[in-house]
């Protein structure tokens, strides 16, 4: 990786912290009560924010980092890790989040971007970062900046999983192509370097992904996951875990749905368990059909 030895060592620690969330569900919460519900349901971590993506989308305006006092209240309410969101490129929001002691920082396209040229240089922070991606190029660029965890961008706040599926399938297909290049030639470097240029991704990270057959860091699903079936679908597509935003606390029975999604991620290969946990959950969030959305209303296109 393009970093000093110290930064590389720090990155190994941060990537290890992200690995600890593997196989888990991370839930958006807006207050201490929701955070406790998430913890009781078996969430691996919570994402503290003032408005879930569905409300950010509905209310409009500039979406910024949440009030630190609200984040601290959630941190005091639970024993599981707490994440919080900062705007793309807003390294001072990240400094504040690190100063109050959040466990992970999400440089998130759900908030209004603060910089149209640069993402945060995440190697400068001790806290591990999670970032979204739509494809392998975006994922590897974020990892090169220091992201210890990747998630699909999906289309947050819609309850429509189609974009998350597309982003995961795109990453999988692009890794498969890199792996095919690596395995089909006695000297794959020239072709792999050409593919890295095409993806606008660092060659060393592309080669690592090709060798491993997966991203070098954990890769979670996010954006539109609303049901246990959605969560299991993303796990079967190769995700390491799931973020659920508006899908839990915008549904009919939040406690029951939260537990069901945790169970679905744990037993994602068992249709009988999935059928059982999908019963009697009340109404799922009504949501928005992504195919009816205008391009300018899509959050996933934020970032580059």
Swiss-Prot record:
Gene Ontology molecular function: amine-lyase activity; pyridoxal 5'-phosphate synthase (glutamine hydrolysing) activity
InterPro entries: Aldolase_TIM, PdxS/SNZ, PdxS/SNZ_N, RibuloseP-bd_barrel
EC numbers on record: 4.3.3.6
Binding site for D-ribose 5-phosphate: 28, 157, 224, 245-246
Family recorded in the similarity comment: Belongs to the PdxS/SNZ family.
Top-level class of the enzyme under EC nomenclature: lyase
Cellular component GO terms, alphabetical: extracellular region
Pathway in which the depicted protein is active: Cofactor biosynthesis; pyridoxal 5'-phosphate biosynthesis
Disruption-associated phenotype: Defects cause some indirect sensitivity to photosensitizers, due to the inability to synthesize pyridoxal 5'-phosphate. Indeed, pyridoxal 5'-phosphate is destroyed in the presence of photosensitizers, and cannot be synthesized in reaction.
Keyword tags: Lyase, Pyridoxal phosphate, Schiff base
Residues annotated as signal peptide: none
Catalytic activity: aldehydo-D-ribose 5-phosphate + D-glyceraldehyde 3-phosphate + L-glutamine = pyridoxal 5'-phosphate + L-glutamate + phosphate + 3 H2O + H(+)
Role played: Catalyzes the formation of pyridoxal 5'-phosphate from ribose 5-phosphate (RBP), glyceraldehyde 3-phosphate (G3P) and ammonia. The ammonia is provided by PDX2. Can also use ribulose 5-phosphate and dihydroxyacetone phosphate as substrates, resulting from enzyme-catalyzed isomerization of RBP and G3P, respectively. Also plays an indirect role in resistance to singlet oxygen-generating photosensitizers.
Record: residues binding D-glyceraldehyde 3-phosphate: 169
PROSITE patterns referenced in this protein's UniProt entry, alphabetically: PDXS_SNZ_1 (PS01235), PDXS_SNZ_2 (PS51129)
Cross-referenced PANTHER family: PYRIDOXAL 5'-PHOSPHATE SYNTHASE SUBUNIT SNZ1-RELATED (PTHR31829:SF0)
HAMAP family hit by this protein: PdxS
Positions of the catalytic residues: 85
Entries under SUPFAM superfamilies matching the protein: Ribulose-phoshate binding barrel
GO biological process: amino acid metabolic process; pyridoxal phosphate biosynthetic process; pyridoxine biosynthetic process
Protein name per its UniProtKB record: Pyridoxal 5'-phosphate synthase subunit pyroA
């Amino acid at each position: 990786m393009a970093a000093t030895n110290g930064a590389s060592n720090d990155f190994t620690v941060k990537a290890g912290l992200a690995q600890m969330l593997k196989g888990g569900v991370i839930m958006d919460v807006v207050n201490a009560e929701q955070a406790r519900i998430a913890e009781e349901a078996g969430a691996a971590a919570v994402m503290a924010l003032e408005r879930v993506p569905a409300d950010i989308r509905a209310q409009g305006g500039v979406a910024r980092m949440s009030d630190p006092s609200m984040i601290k209240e959630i941190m005091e309410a639970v024993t599981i890790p707490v994440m919080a969101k900062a705007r793309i490129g807003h390294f001072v929001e990240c400094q504040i989040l690190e100063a109050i002691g959040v466990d992970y920082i999400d440089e998130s396209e759900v908030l209004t971007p603060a910089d149209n040229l640069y993402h945060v240089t995440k190697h400068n922070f001790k806290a591990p970062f999670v970032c979204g991606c739509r494809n392998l190029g975006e994922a590897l660029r974020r990892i090169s900046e220091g992201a210890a965890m990747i998630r699909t961008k999906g289309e947050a706040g819609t309850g429509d999983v189609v974009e998350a599926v597309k982003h995961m399938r795109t990453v999988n297909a692009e890794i498969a192509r890199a792996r095919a290049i690596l395995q089909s030639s006695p000297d794959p470097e020239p072709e792999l370097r050409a593919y890295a240029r095409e993806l606008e991704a660092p060659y060393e990270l592309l080669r690592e992904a090709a060798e491993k057959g997966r991203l070098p860091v954990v890769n979670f699903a996010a954006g539109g996951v609303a049901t246990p079936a959605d969560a299991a679908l993303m796990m079967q597509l190769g995700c390491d875990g799931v973020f659920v935003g508006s899908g839990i606390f915008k549904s009919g029975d939040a406690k029951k749905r939260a537990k069901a999604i945790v169970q679905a991620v744990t037993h994602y290969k068992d249709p009988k368990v999935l059928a059982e946990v999908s019963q009697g959950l009340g109404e799922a969030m009504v949501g928005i059909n992504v195919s009816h959305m205008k391009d300018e209303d899509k959050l996933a296109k934020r970032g580059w």
